[in-house]
């Protein structure tokens, strides 16, 4: 009680000083700023985690989401503060709405990095993130005329989690020099100490460069480097800008790391004993040649010494087997952007070429392109995949040539999620019920969720879990009505697919199912329980087919929701500007989690884990972490469909998949695909977009939508039928929650530390 009084007194003092008001008289926006200040003060009192060895997690993106709720939970003051605000007629959830969401990431890669930082701090490990401070992030998604429009996402406010450290470094791009400014965001562990997320900005950044939408002068690098995450790279200027950004990040990161090591008094020759650098995907790869450059040109190392030290310091996480996502930069671009790295990269490449003749493992290929992943594998000490099946595909197929050379470097670290955000913060009701039922040990040791299995025949427990889900669905209905203007039925089945828009994730297959179901209802076959399909996804502005898929979904939602024959039985909504905050509303309300990527293409996925933890049942392919979810929950608590990865890989090897064959032999597939260009759809949508998507499915279909479509329809219909058996469904929900403990990022990080970083 005394602590609570102190907290209330402190907050009143802060709001009094800022606004001349007490808590009760403040607006939600004012209270957000006050609580932000209070939280930052509490974090400043939290000891920084220290140790002999430290990990630096370098990533192009950190999709951290809003931080207020998470920080309050980790500091252990969420409940107290919530009660104080309630006492003063205020609601913490309303205050959280006033917080802008940092726009520092895009998809699973950035969200994983954020979960990892939370777990590193929670486990008391010394570890900081290194990235860039994007002013407008990826983009803000706005729907107009059934199309995605991109606008700048202006999120940085005067009062924010960003702390200007005053630290500056110089970064040279040949003769062009820029000065960086370092901003830190504090990362507090759950009931533990503090680490940092280091975000570099440029001193001369100019937001006024952005004129219309997200268009800006890509060549003004002294002003534009930190404006956007993943600027459009469909032209040479865009490609060069990405290299500028990547080098800016790693040059700053390398200087910061070496500065910290020197300040601790360590000899740089002992760098691997004091530093582990985790390279998150290929974007930070240039940290390897950059460290070698600094050590040889500024620290007196020989080339052999520098390569040896750096190779024992850097480790690489592979996140994809998609060829287009494994960066390959023309050597001429690197020569132009960072001429000082050119001789280092050539030296690294020559050493590989002398040792290995296989063209597939060269750093610089015959077309004079630099393969970034190849630098990571040759000159790092660890290569990890992010799910069991993904790592096996890397070893046996995609990176097999490297695996034969370095079998000892390859290891698997199945991804995880932080339960603080994805349970304690986003579903207070479920977290409170679990604590009441099995105790609160699961908050520190997620495997304790298994205790829930002891209650799988306890009707009161089953009913409570089901009722919490209904509550979250009702809350989501209200939120979507407010945000999207669509009225949903809380008693319908919520079938949700939220993730980056990409053909391999196959939102287009879900769209074809929805068309099939729409036509069934029009033909008089009505579902027993109404259906609600929810999508959330952004498409890269230069990715035309992805834009077309969004167009089809928006057109279909217009047709379905405005058809009086269909809308009582089925609704479709694509939420605008899907982000972490939206995910925190959608995930607890989901019944069926759509994880339908083409087998072999999704490295892991983490959305599947978040949905599972919140009691949704997975409908998915045998891909990524779905495979491990399947193993944990068993055949009766998941819906698996489609061809397996071996079959898919064989189709690619033989180049024998012809989508038109499936279209011709299946009336169901033909009817659904043809509907895309039917009069009914063309009346609402744009002919160019719809015909392009139609032709893509019929003539190319690179990610084999039509291969799995019939099985998808059959298994999804089965899932909807099973939902009618409430008792069965409640047990499925319970088993999924109970078995989710394995997917805690605390477990993942403990494994990284045990096998890769070896921090004390």
Positions of the model-derived regions?
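A conserved ligand/cofactor-binding region detector
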Residues: 1-760
